[in-house]
Amino acid sequence: MTVVGLIWAQSTTGVIGRDGGMPWRVPEDLTRFKQLTMGHPVVMGRRTWDSLPVGVRPLPGRRNIVLSRQIDFMAEGAEVFGSLEETISNLETEPEMWVIGGEQIYRLALPLATRCGVTEVDTYLLHEDDDVLAPVLDDTWVGVTGEWLVSCSGLRYRLHSYHRS
């Protein structure tokens, strides 16, 4: 059975996206993202796919899967499926997969996930109407939180690793 992991970066107020992108720059988070997802399928929604810079779309070294309800949607270099169930059945031989966004896909995958990798960026963002918010982890999740670190961009961040208890 394929292990389902979720990975995201969020502000201290739970914002993971704003205006079609991430509202901060923390290169160390991208390094961690690459370390955890490299060699594994990454599953994302169409808007997350569209938000990836053209130069790294599809994400290299990973099987890229885009979920879309739009029947004729095509994503060059990626596979497109209409549901998470269809995706998982096509990944049954894979040891693990990572869900990389967005909000709707996290919500669908959260009940199936057994691990989460979260980068918390020490920035306070008031919620705006179109913000994308991080999933809320309930008390079935147990986490380990690292110390605050300072990014080369000057922002403080810390890493959280969660698994189902």
UniProtKB/Swiss-Prot annotation:
Pathway as given in its UniProt record: Cofactor biosynthesis; tetrahydrofolate biosynthesis; 5,6,7,8-tetrahydrofolate from 7,8-dihydrofolate: step 1/1
UniProt keyword annotations, A-Z: NADP, One-carbon metabolism, Oxidoreductase
This protein's record includes keyword NADP: yes
Binding site for NADP(+): 8-9, 16-21, 45-48, 67-70, 100-105
Gene3D superfamilies attached to this UniProt entry: Dihydrofolate Reductase, subunit A (3.40.430.10)
Any Pfam family hit: DHFR_1
Binding locations of substrate: I7, W8, A9, D29, R62, T119
Reactions catalysed, as given in the entry: (6S)-5,6,7,8-tetrahydrofolate + NADP(+) = 7,8-dihydrofolate + NADPH + H(+)
GO molecular function: dihydrofolate reductase activity; NADP binding
InterPro entries for the chain: DHFR (IPR012259), DHFR-like_dom_sf (IPR024072), DHFR_CS (IPR017925), DHFR_dom (IPR001796)
Boundaries of every DHFR domain copy: 3-165
EC number: 1.5.1.3
SUPFAM superfamilies: Dihydrofolate reductase-like (SSF53597)
Any one cellular-component term (Gene Ontology): cytosol
Similarity section: Belongs to the dihydrofolate reductase family.
Protein name (Swiss-Prot/TrEMBL): Dihydrofolate reductase
Primary gene name: folA
